[in-house]
């Protein structure tokens, strides 16, 4: 017998063909199991906010500032200063954020993991993170990688003479890649199958090619056309929550520092970190060109230095952009870039590795877009003529870039949090009055239940308010009661006419209650909407024979229309909400996958998602009072009927059309129609994992457990944005 045959462990656990490879259309429920407590080495008891607040932030910044000019032989600093490298590190960590689903960004330290740690656009950032490891090691649990990466970018800017807008900590690390993020379906780096028609970029993507943070710096698909590149820039930055002025400020401000790297052909560069050998210890892109570092470094393939002072804040970027005329050239690696005509500016720019050498300024195709695009050009000229405006705009845009995915200001930690309230932070006033107590809660529930509002109305309104929350960028939720305001009050999914009726009655209850109070006690509409939903759930459970008390914590406040950014709020509108059996139109993605996507944004587990769908169906919370999935003869009553009837083998299901979006369930023996259901409904009987959970709730002894689990999941969603309770 051979040695190989004798060995009982020829293949490790988990090896072999993955289930998704056998069945590519299989519903991916893994994204509802990410970051489980068992995978977190810090343990459930760890309080990061408390740890961060005990940190001597000034000491950390002092250590970071010392690091800026402490060049290491294994990865020497360009121009003797690591500042530009660290600015790029923070920028590229935050720059993965996109408004479409709120995913990406710097909020969890994802740059440490695949795929972004190995994107072509992130070459050498593995070294940047390794350079700050001694500081992370020194301060340990008191500062997360996520916070340290952003803070390092801030200190880098400050060490180069730039005044930043501020810094808020509070980004808690995770310890695994975020597999919920759709980065595109391309199978090769820098491919761009994400476009259709006349360069229509697939939602929710922002970057133009697989493995890029933003746009191709050489121009669209490498075509060095600054005007065409401006179209890509505008669309990409818009999808990252930046307007034209912020976009110009970010590009110009960022390119006031440092350089790009293209000393030689990319053929000299080794595999990225995720593909590199064990001996590389998590580093990648080892280069065989010259020394492979310093002046010989290869990154993007472009070899551009924008200013005469690449480690000092200046307005040189715009000075060069406008004062020189530019002609196309190529980098040593063969990439398209631009140089001043007639060798203007020769000898005015320092060499990154040899102080005795001088170079000429250069520009990227996308830099020239800021001059030759008609809109960007006017903004750029104004910033050139008014450098103080540029400094303020860049400081604010940088703060927005690095904090956009952190949610409300209430989550910011530390002594450098700006006092100014910014519209993009979705501001909500602080509590300024005594809150309602248990006696008030009971009285208000009684008022709600006597108001004539139905269980479906109460439940649907509370769900519509709370379920806008996105765990990705911590936006949305019931706090603020923005469901009363544009644009939420007019969203199709919220059934505006029906919503208005509910809000009028709740506002009447609120007004009557508040007028009757002394000492300034009030109930906000934000609290009352949630409380009314809880009352509806309790009423529905009582109708099923169970007395339950749905947990309720007052403390939400009402915001105003003036404090609501209409453009920023639009992206929260659901195009699909499987919990309400709502689809805005036809999509290439299956409805059940959109349900799982929504559940992940709501931070739900598989059982929580299952309980909520089953409960909301029998409570009549469907959009447009649709009967799809209402598998009960007792609507408005909180029963496990959805699961009992879905799992009934006496029902035979058939699609009602070739689109296979809606199905009819008929008596298997007589053919008499019983129910109709959507893909979202039937997946709980079709998918093996979801069926296993549905069978728990469909059992003869499951009614009490189902109600308990539904109430727990409901309460979780109602409180997702209550960061003050966590």
UniProtKB/Swiss-Prot annotation:
InterPro entries linked: Catalase_peroxidase, Haem_peroxidase, Haem_peroxidase_sf, Peroxidases_AS, Peroxidases_heam-ligand_BS
Highest taxon listed in the record's lineage: Bacteria
Keywords recorded for this protein, A-Z: Heme, Hydrogen peroxide, Iron, Metal-binding, Oxidoreductase, Peroxidase, Plasmid
Binding site for heme b: 255
Keyword check for Oxidoreductase: yes
SUPFAM superfamilies assigned: Heme-dependent peroxidases (SSF48113)
GO terms for biological process, alphabetical: cellular response to hydrogen peroxide; hydrogen peroxide catabolic process
Cofactor: heme b
GO molecular function terms listed in the Swiss-Prot or TrEMBL record: catalase activity; heme binding; metal ion binding
Cofactor descriptive note: Binds 1 heme b (iron(II)-protoporphyrin IX) group per dimer.
Post-translational modification: Formation of the three residue Trp-Tyr-Met cross-link is important for the catalase, but not the peroxidase activity of the enzyme.
Region (Disordered): 335-362
An annotated GO cellular component: cytosol
Short name of any one Pfam family annotated for the protein: peroxidase
Cross-link (Tryptophyl-tyrosyl-methioninium (Tyr-Met) (with W-91)): 214-240
Family: Belongs to the peroxidase family. Peroxidase/catalase subfamily.
Function: Bifunctional enzyme with both catalase and broad-spectrum peroxidase activity.
Subunit structure: Homodimer or homotetramer.
Record's protein name: Catalase-peroxidase
